[in-house]
From Swiss-Prot:
It comes from Campylobacter jejuni (strain RM1221). This is NAD kinase. NAD(+) binds at D74, G75, N148, D149, D178, A186, T189, A190, Y191, N192, L193, S194, Q244. The keyword Membrane does not apply. The active site is at D74 (proton acceptor). One of its GO terms (molecular function) is metal ion binding. The keyword Phosphoprotein does not apply. It catalyses: NAD(+) + ATP = ADP + NADP(+) + H(+). GO terms for cellular component: cytoplasm.
Length: 286
């Protein structure tokens, strides 16, 4: 994954907005800022119907851009990060709406950011994703990536989920309840946190198993290391990747999950403080 950005030779920056939201005013402001540095802003086709700016499909946008801006919330950034892995391109998150854990600043602050950026004043962080291997009943394997989490939940709200977890063909644990969350460190502040899972530092090489409303008082979240692959078996359950892709577990004979070797390069302001963000979002201290 991209370790360095040649900030002195940036020619094109791609931009993707959250769907079904008009952000033309914000896009024009970003274009105006980038034009100062002789950088062309190019858009995903769906990002604006009105603006007269170059527009491309997502694959072509990644191919021609030096890096890509996600303009929206954490959800927009999450889906973009999975695609960024395919093209070894970095992503910058600018939020439009509520401040998330992943997007750092609003468009109103972009002028200051890019002034520093084009002087080399920025940082790159590379959180790891989850690899998900879904093997169907014909033996065909579908590989997917998850930036935040993989959630196994009951298909029928009236029933209880029964989820078995194996490691090297030996049963590792068994869960009865509403479901199970497999979260990355970056995703530890999302659904995992709501289910009383631990917060894990974003760049840690680990992942988390957190039961959802377990019917046993002894079931607790556990943090597992990179290289620890689990197999998950559950009948009549749904597997959801990053809240965006759903699969019926009955359609697969094997589902394996572990921390991927793949990471995504996220561009941040140089003064970004992860723990200050936690303090502000979670109201720690004064």
């Amino acid at each position: 994954m991209q370790n360095k950005i040649d900030y002195k030779n940036i020619k094109k920056i791609g931009l993707v907005t959250r769907p079904n939201v008009s952000l033309d005013k914000e896009i024009l402001k970003l274009q105006s800022i980038l034009s100062i540095y002789k950088v062309e802003l190019v858009l995903l086709k769906e990002s604006s119907e009105i603006l007269d700016l170059p527009k491309y499909g997502l694959d072509d946008l990644f191919k021609i851009s030096d890096f890509v801006i996600s303009l929206g919330g954490d959800g927009t950034l999450i889906s973009l990060c999975r695609k960024a892995c395919e093209y070894d391109k970095a992503v910058l998150g600018i939020h439009a709406g509520h401040l998330g854990f992943l997007t750092d600043f609003k468009v109103d602050e972009a002028e200051n950011f890019f002034q520093a950026f084009f002087q080399g004043e920025f940082r790159i962080e590379k959180p790891y994703l989850l690899s998900v291997f879904l093997e169907d009943k014909q033996g065909k394997i579908l590989e997917k990536l998850a930036f935040n989490d993989v959630v196994i939940s009951k298909n029928n709200q009236a029933s209880m989920a029964h989820i078995e977890v194996f490691r090297k063909e030996k049963k590792f644990n068994e869960y009865f309840g509403d479901g199970l969350i497999v979260a990355t460190p970056a995703g530890s502040t999302a659904y995992n946190l709501s289910a009383n899972g631990p917060i894990v530092y974003t760049l840690a090489q680990a992942f988390i198993l957190t039961p959802v409303c377990s019917h046993s008082l002894t079931q607790r979240p556990i943090v597992l290391p990179k290289g620890f692959e689990i197999e998950i078996m559950a009948k009549d359950c749904i597997l959801c990747i990053d809240g965006q892709e759903n699969y019926k577990m009955n359609d697969f004979k094997s589902i394996k999950v572990g921390l991927s070797d793949k990471n995504v390069a996220l561009i941040h302001p140089k003064n970004r403080d992860y723990f200050q963000i936690l303090k502000e979002k979670l109201h720690w201290g004064n």
